[in-house]
């Protein structure tokens, strides 16, 4: 299958992009290497999320994933190891050996915290 769009990164930006891509009637695959929801899932209490007085980051991550999937977005828990553009398509290769092809690619890999290597960090 050739997807209209592949989104690399399943955090808030990637999942929101996938939701809007599906609402536009395009096929989309979201590839995330660790956990869907991104860094927000590390927050135990979020008090500035519209519509909620208080909600956990994990709940926000779950809601974003559920909404994207409800719209028809496909999701894969894979690590992307390479991307190549040949001709009109782009090929995304994962560590498992799986290959996916798309017409457009969004890279929404977010960030990760730096660690000091301390015990119990």
Region locations from a protein language model:
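Beta1-alpha1 glycine-rich phosphate/pyrophosphate-binding loop at the start
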Residues: 3-71
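FAD-binding core/adjacent interface of flavoenzyme oxidoreductases
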Residues: 1-8, 23-24, 29, 61, ...
């Amino acid at each position: 299958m050739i997807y209209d769009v592949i989104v690399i990164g399943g955090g808030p930006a990637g999942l929101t992009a996938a939701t809007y891509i599906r609402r536009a009637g395009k096929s989309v695959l979201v590839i995330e290497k660790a956990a869907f929801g991104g860094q927000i899932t590390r927050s135990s209490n979020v008090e500035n999320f519209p519509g909620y007085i208080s909600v956990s980051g994990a709940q926000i991550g779950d809601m974003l994933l559920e909404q994207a999937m409800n719209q028809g977005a496909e999701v894969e828990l894979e690590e992307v190891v390479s991307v190549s553009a040949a001709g009109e398509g782009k090929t995304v290769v994962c560590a498992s050996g799986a290959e996916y092809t798309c017409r457009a690619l969004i890279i929404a890999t977010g960030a990760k915290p730096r660690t000091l290597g301390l015990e119990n960090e």
